[in-house]
């Protein structure tokens, strides 16, 4: 019996991981030349790091690669329309759709102004409310508190819905801000997903774990093309999709607050922008040479590879802390 269970778990881990990885590896060489031909290139902000100007024109919307890779892997595994994996896929698609619209408008206008803030927020709130309602009616309104006995959970009641709406806005924007240098958001997110996959298997949330591991595999495959020097960027299509699906994975595991710990890099990136903007408005001075903070480290001479390596290592440490916090 024990061997049978181990075999089942191993197949649930290896099959989606390998499929996600291989599908991304196959799709990359197909999508990159197509996006080049369509001139779906990234417009680089003039106020950004000067070293990034040479990246102008690099194909964007690479999130399509790991979305298709993950979706294909999950569908091959054979899922029912309202299974947790399909709900995760729906949330992946919903937030990715917002990013897709944003990317398309940037390409059309040939600048970094895509959807207006109000337009993006309306769509974010719309999809967040739908997922909050799903959580409220199907998952429960109680959430785990880090470093507190798992038997104790904070029950938010009806306040759960507005909490989740704000939570989605925070997570999606945080991941979006992290996607500023080659391979950073991809690498950090692979580690975060691995954490949630392990938790999913440990808590018998196998559907959630399978999705997380399939997406982690797809991102590892995508990293072949997204690592420095990047041949393609994930774009808002990818970063908003990742933020949304990480939010939903944590929601299903009742670990919304754990995103603050294991996704500490996302939090630091966001706080650096808030601190920079607030300081400049109040004092006329900047705390960092540039924000988000990964650009600050670029300005002081760190290479993109060094930043990704250190930030990924920090994420791995934060995930260990996340396990301790259970």
From Swiss-Prot:
GO terms for biological process: cell division; cell wall organization; peptidoglycan biosynthetic process; regulation of cell shape. One of its GO terms (molecular function) is phospho-N-acetylmuramoyl-pentapeptide-transferase activity. Keywords: Cell cycle, Cell division, Cell membrane, Cell shape, Cell wall biogenesis/degradation, Magnesium, Membrane, Metal-binding, Peptidoglycan synthesis, Transferase, Transmembrane, Transmembrane helix. It is a multi-pass membrane protein. Signal peptide: none annotated. The keyword NADP does not apply. The gene is mraY. Catalyzes the initial step of the lipid cycle reactions in the biosynthesis of the cell wall peptidoglycan: transfers peptidoglycan precursor phospho-MurNAc-pentapeptide from UDP-MurNAc-pentapeptide onto the lipid carrier undecaprenyl phosphate, yielding undecaprenyl-pyrophosphoryl-MurNAc-pentapeptide, known as lipid I. Its EC number is 2.7.8.13. This is Phospho-N-acetylmuramoyl-pentapeptide-transferase. It comes from the Bacteria. Its cofactor is Mg(2+). It is found in: Cell membrane. The lineage of its organism: Bacteria, Bacillati, Bacillota, Clostridia, Eubacteriales. Its main location: membrane. The keyword DNA-binding does not apply. One of its GO terms (cellular component) is plasma membrane. The chain crosses the membrane at residues 13-33, 57-77, 85-105, 121-141, 155-175, 181-201, 208-228, 232-252, 257-277, 305-325. Belongs to the glycosyltransferase 4 family. MraY subfamily. It is an enzyme of class 2 (transferase). It catalyses: UDP-N-acetyl-alpha-D-muramoyl-L-alanyl-gamma-D-glutamyl-meso-2,6-diaminopimeloyl-D-alanyl-D-alanine + di-trans,octa-cis-undecaprenyl phosphate = di-trans,octa-cis-undecaprenyl diphospho-N-acetyl-alpha-D-muramoyl-L-alanyl-D-glutamyl-meso-2,6-diaminopimeloyl-D-alanyl-D-alanine + UMP. Pathway: Cell wall biogenesis; peptidoglycan biosynthesis.
